[in-house]
């Protein structure tokens, strides 16, 4: 009778569902079992592997010490490294972007298409097409021609600005200037208004024949689009903040005359700054 503490020999069973117990590791035959007589050989092989690992670790250690000697150290003892752009380079990958076009902007997009795609193709070196089936504009980078890593995002912002309702010239400014942004908010984000109250708030922002909107744009050097209850502002960071304050005050019920007075102060500050 076998003692309860004795160990039984493990029997090697082939994996079910595979023909002839074939291995799932291609190129290496690891289905052979190890006999008890081959234990010494296995131990010798392990020792050889350990010595090989020690040799590799020694080579890597010497390589690291050699690389550490080439690092430039400043006066304070801190290492100085070259810029990543010079060492690694800018690698452009195949990337694509799809910008959906609202139905009411499809006709302006078709009419201005001959002026929209040249900046994307010639300046940003992107591949662009208008998909009429899905009503979208598709952009794609090409590593052979595209050089700017942020070209795809710039092109997407340009198309998005046009679909929001901005003029073509104002949208192209996003490609030329890096400090332009678009901020979007709704009237209900400022104050919950419905029915005629909402219509009057939008009317106060626009003014008669767009007079108030143009005054805010000229004073703050921004561009404003009123799309129903949504308001889109294009401009610099500080300019957007000034225009947003004027629009918010109009939504909250401030009379246009008071807003005009604040705009004069804002315009004088901008003239002093620039």
Curated annotation (Swiss-Prot):
Pfam families: KH_KRR1_1st, KH_PNO1_2nd. Changing residue 235 to D: Accumulation of aberrant 22S and 23S rRNA intermediates. Residues 195-247 form the KH domain. Residues 1-70 are annotated as: Disordered. The modification Phosphothreonine is found at residue 51. One of its GO terms (biological process) is ribosomal small subunit export from nucleus. One of its GO terms (molecular function) is rRNA primary transcript binding. Residues 33-48 have a biased composition (Acidic residues). CDD domains: KH-I_PNO1_rpt1, KH-I_PNO1_rpt2. InterPro entries: KH-I_PNO1_first, KH_dom_type_1_sf, KH_PNO1_2nd, KRR1-like_KH1. The modification Phosphoserine is found at residue 47. It is found in: Cytoplasm; Nucleus, Nucleolus. PANTHER family: RIBONUCLEASE Y, RNA-BINDING PROTEIN PNO1. Component of the small ribosomal subunit, ribosomal RNA processing complex (SSU RRP complex). Interacts with NOB1. Belongs to the PNO1 family. This is Pre-rRNA-processing protein PNO1. It comes from Saccharomyces cerevisiae (strain ATCC 204508 / S288c) (Baker's yeast).
């Amino acid at each position: 009778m076998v003692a309860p503490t004795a160990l039984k020999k493990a029997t090697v069973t082939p994996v079910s569902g595979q023909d002839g117990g074939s291995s799932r590791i291609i190129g290496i035959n690891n289905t052979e079992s190890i006999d008890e007589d081959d234990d010494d050989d296995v131990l010798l092989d392990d020792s050889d592997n350990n010595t090989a690992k020690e040799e590799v670790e020694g080579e890597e250690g010497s390589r690291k010490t050699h690389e550490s000697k080439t690092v430039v150290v400043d006066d304070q003892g801190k290492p100085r490294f070259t810029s990543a752009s010079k060492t690694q380079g800018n690698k452009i990958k195949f990337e694509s972007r799809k910008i959906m076009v609202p139905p009411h902007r499809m006709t302006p997009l078709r009419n201005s298409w001959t002026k929209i795609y040249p900046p994307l193709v010639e300046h940003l070196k992107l591949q662009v097409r208008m998909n009429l089936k899905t009503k979208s504009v598709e952009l794609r980078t090409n590593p052979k021609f595209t050089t700017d890593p942020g070209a795809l995002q710039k092109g997407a912002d340009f198309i998005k600005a046009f679909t929001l309702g901005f003029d073509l010239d104002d949208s192209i400014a996003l490609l030329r200037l890096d400090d332009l942004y678009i901020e979007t908010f709704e009237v209900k984000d400022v104050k919950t208004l419905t029915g005629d109250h909402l219509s009057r708030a939008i009317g106060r922002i626009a003014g008669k024949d767009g007079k108030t909107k143009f005054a805010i744009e000229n004073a703050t050097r921004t561009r404003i689009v009123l799309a129903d209850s949504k308001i889109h502002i294009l401009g610099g960071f500080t300019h957007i903040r000034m225009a947003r304050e004027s629009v918010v005050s109009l939504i909250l019920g401030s009379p246009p005359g008071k807003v005009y007075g604040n705009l004069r102060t804002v315009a004088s500050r901008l003239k002093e700054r620039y």
